[in-house]
């Protein structure tokens, strides 16, 4: 088991900021098209974070042209250039699947205050 843990530790990313469900994040993705590389930004609310070692994932939801788009990102993916936390949200759940049914102002998340 020590060999497996050692390999997992070597493959983990340490440059990812701490974020949780309800936060608004910008995920900078490295896209390879032929020989060219470019960075594409996916900004939205984190609706789920699955912790773990190398298999950790997080789900980001955004509204694009009136259509909800969700994308699941592996946290240790080499295609993720960086993750920025834009705002921190105050929520009482760890899984925000109820946002799928809400539209407009009802789908807003309150900002987390400093108390």
UniProtKB/Swiss-Prot annotation:
SUPFAM superfamilies: Translation proteins SH3-like domain. One of its GO terms (biological process) is translation. PROSITE patterns: RIBOSOMAL_L19. Keywords: Ribonucleoprotein, Ribosomal protein. One of its GO terms (molecular function) is structural constituent of ribosome. Gene3D superfamilies: 2.30.30.790. GO terms for cellular component: cytosolic large ribosomal subunit. Pfam families: Ribosomal_L19. It comes from the Bacteria. This protein is located at the 30S-50S ribosomal subunit interface and may play a role in the structure and function of the aminoacyl-tRNA binding site. Belongs to the bacterial ribosomal protein bL19 family. NCBIfam families: rplS_bact (TIGR01024). This is Large ribosomal subunit protein bL19. It comes from Desulfovibrio desulfuricans (strain ATCC 27774 / DSM 6949 / MB).
